[in-house]
């Protein structure tokens, strides 16, 4: 393509791990180990952030902070966040490979992008240790990006644009408007907006829907419709220029953005 130069994907819930399920059990188990219960819905709230800020956000929830204070006699502080994080990371690493299945359609879209001379980048809220468990399996299934930028590679994670700014030069792209960020989380969409890229939300395969593929397929049509509408509205409220069900639906959006850039439009 002449105008679109790069697509930057998130990982969990966008290209692997349908429903973004891997971190959820790890978060719940970790807090349970400290004698504080959290729900899956609570755990999902800050998804897309780096994992230590994610834990900090969970511990700042009034109900969780009160439960922590009841258990330990003080409000959660930095040392407590570190303690929870140190327990969480090995749990996430342990399950990551089990949730590295590439989401249907991703490999075909990656091939189509390469056929159009579009570079493929990725950013993630995962650490490099966690990604080491995911990348080989994804590559074997047909998804191997040109760039992977992880939590810890930049001064701040999402919603800051630092990971975008690191990715673009690695892809040889210097105009952010020529890139598309694809993400299933609100902070991931904000990352793209803050970085000056086009932003495409993924509603059904990711965190906003939060269900395994088989469970999604089993939903009654009316329930699927309202869940999809709610997920779409969340991502649009975060600033997404487009919202698709999954990456399998991406190529028509890429062509539309190509046409808009040709007309002189900007994100």
UniProtKB/Swiss-Prot annotation:
Task: Give UniProt keywords alphabetically.
Answer: Hydrolase, Magnesium, Metal-binding, Schiff base
Similarity comment: Belongs to the HAD-like hydrolase superfamily. PhnX family.
- Cofactor remark: Binds 1 Mg(2+) ion per subunit.
GO biological process terms on file: DNA repair; organic phosphonate catabolic process
Q: Which GO terms describe its molecular function?
A: magnesium ion binding; phosphoglycolate phosphatase activity; phosphonoacetaldehyde hydrolase activity
InterPro entries named in the record = HAD-like_hydrolase_sf, HAD-like_sf, HAD_sf, PGP-like_dom2, Phosphonoacetald_hydro
Instruction: Tell me the protein's name.
Output: Phosphonoacetaldehyde hydrolase
- Check the record and name the SUPFAM superfamilies matching this protein: HAD-like
> Where are the active-site residues found?
10, 51
Binding locations of Mg(2+): 10, 12, 184
Species the sequence originates in: Paraburkholderia phytofirmans (strain DSM 17436 / LMG 22146 / PsJN) (Burkholderia phytofirmans)
Q: Which HAMAP family match?
A: PhnX
Which top-rank group of organisms is this from? Bacteria
């Amino acid at each position: 393509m002449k105008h679109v130069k790069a697509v930057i994907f998130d990982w969990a819930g966008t290209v692997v791990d349908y429903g973004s399920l891997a971190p959820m059990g790890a978060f719940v188990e970790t807090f349970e180990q400290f004698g504080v219960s959290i729900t899956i819905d609570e755990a999902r709230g800050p998804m897309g952030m780096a994992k230590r800020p994610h834990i900090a956000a969970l511990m700042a929830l009034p109900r969780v902070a009160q439960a922590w204070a009841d258990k330990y006699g003080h409000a959660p502080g930095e040392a407590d966040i570190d303690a929870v994080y140190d327990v969480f990371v090995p749990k996430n690493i342990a399950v990551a490979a089990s949730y590295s299945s590439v989401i249907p359609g991703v490999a075909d879209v990656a091939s189509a992008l390469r056929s159009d001379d579009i570079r493929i980048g990725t950013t993630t809220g995962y650490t490099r240790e966690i990604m080491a468990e995911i990348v080989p399996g994804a590559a074997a299934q047909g998804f191997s990006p040109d760039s992977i930028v992880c939590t810890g590679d930049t001064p701040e994670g999402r919603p800051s644009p630092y990971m975008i700014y690191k990715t673009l030069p690695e892809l040889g792209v210097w105009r952010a408007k020529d890139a598309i960020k694809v993400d299933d989380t609100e902070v991931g969409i904000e990352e793209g907006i803050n970085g000056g890229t086009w932003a495409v939300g993924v509603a059904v395969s990711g965190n906003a829907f939060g269900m395994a593929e088989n469970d999604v397929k089993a939903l009654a049509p009316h329930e699927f419709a309202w869940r999809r509408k709610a997920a779409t509205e969340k991502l649009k409220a975060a600033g997404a220029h487009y919202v698709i069900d999954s990456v399998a639906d991406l190529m028509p959006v890429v062509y539309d953005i190509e046409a808009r850039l040709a007309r002189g439009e900007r994100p």
